[in-house]
């Protein structure tokens, strides 16, 4: 039974998701379809990359991941000047870590990979001859590509192997002497604030080094990493390393629509800065370490 995951920006209000699933079930006999999310902000390939990067490894190798975000290709007939060639986008298949990823090469692939190296990358160039597919690529072209993978059609029979791909802009944390400057990259359903600061960024400064996590809401700094949300009392602020080892700031039992998530209470939005300042031995904050 072939597992196929679906990530898109087409929402749940309309028939679009059902239409994609219906065609997949016709094209791939016995397919097991798993929704990751269809609530990606329209055309936001960076968010799609974050969501899929956070969970793809939970699926067995051989899983096919379809990414229906900003899918319409930008093809050569639209080019009026050679300088525009870097704008070209094609439906592509990425193989990475034993998984298959079908998406438009619109920045998703490079952002998903980060520092990772693809096993292979294939471009579906025949799309230039299939204008009837352009307006709903996830239902048409992407389903056909998934079917070819399942049926073990050789990639050389329907794609061209390439080694270049685009990357959307995503901020990386800035690591300086005694400080990490990061950003909010995602706010989840509970209003929890997820940053681009990883656990390994913390560990570069050594173990048991005092620190302060600061953000927009003054006087609400955090100076401890908890193991679980319930390590603090209900409605208290908490910092943890989440399932993906990213620094997360939350309100215990807080939720948007309830008591209020951390994003509301702290006035945090996507892109807002989050700073971690360390106080190593001998610093003004940590003079006791010299005694």
Task: Give each language-model segment a name.
Residues 196-269:
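A conserved acidic, glycine/proline-rich C-terminal tail/linker
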Residues 35-55:
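N-terminal beta-loop-helix "entrance" segment that forms/cooperates
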Residues 128-207:
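Anionic-ligand-binding alpha/beta catalytic cores of soluble enzymes and soluble regulatory domains
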Residues 3, 27, 32-33, 45-47, ...:
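Active-site histidine-anchored catalytic micro-motif
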Residues 259-291:
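Conserved glycine-rich phosphate/nucleotide-binding loop
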Residues 8-10, 36, 68-71, 96-97, ...:
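Fold-independent oxyanion-binding glycine-rich loops
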Residues 2-39:
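N-terminal glycine-rich anion-binding loop in soluble enzyme alpha/beta folds
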């Amino acid at each position: 039974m072939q597992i196929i995951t679906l990530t898109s920006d087409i929402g749940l209000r309309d028939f679009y998701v059902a239409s994609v699933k219906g065609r997949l079930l016709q094209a791939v006999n016995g397919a097991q379809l798993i929704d990751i999310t269809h609530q990606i902000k329209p055309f936001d390939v960076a968010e799609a990359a974050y969501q899929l990067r956070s969970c793809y490894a939970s699926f067995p190798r051989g899983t096919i991941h379809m990414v229906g975000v900003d899918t319409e290709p930008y093809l050569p007939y639209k080019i009026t000047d050679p300088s525009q060639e870097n704008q070209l986008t094609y439906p592509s298949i990425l193989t990475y870590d034993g998984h298959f990823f079908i998406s438009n090469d619109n920045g998703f692939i490079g952002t998903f990979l980060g520092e990772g190296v693809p096993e292979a990358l294939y471009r579906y160039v025949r799309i230039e001859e299939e204008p009837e597919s352009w307006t709903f690529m996830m239902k048409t072209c992407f389903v056909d590509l998934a079917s070819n993978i399942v049926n073990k059609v050789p990639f050389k029979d329907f794609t061209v192997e390439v080694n270049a791909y685009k990357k959307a802009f995503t901020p990386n944390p800035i690591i300086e002497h005694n400080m990490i400057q990061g950003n909010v990259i995602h706010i989840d359903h509970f209003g929890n604030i997820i940053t681009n600061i990883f656990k390994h960024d913390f560990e570069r400064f050594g173990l048991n080094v005092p620190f302060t996590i600061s953000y927009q809401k003054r006087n609400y700094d955090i100076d401890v990493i908890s193991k679980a949300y319930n390590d603090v009392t209900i409605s208290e602020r908490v910092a943890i390393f989440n399932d993906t080892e990213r620094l997360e700031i939350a309100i215990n039992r807080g939720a948007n629509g309830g008591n209020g998530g951390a994003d509301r209470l702290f006035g945090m939005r996507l892109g807002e800065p989050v700073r971690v300042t360390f106080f190593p031995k001998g610093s003004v904050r940590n003079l006791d370490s010299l005694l």
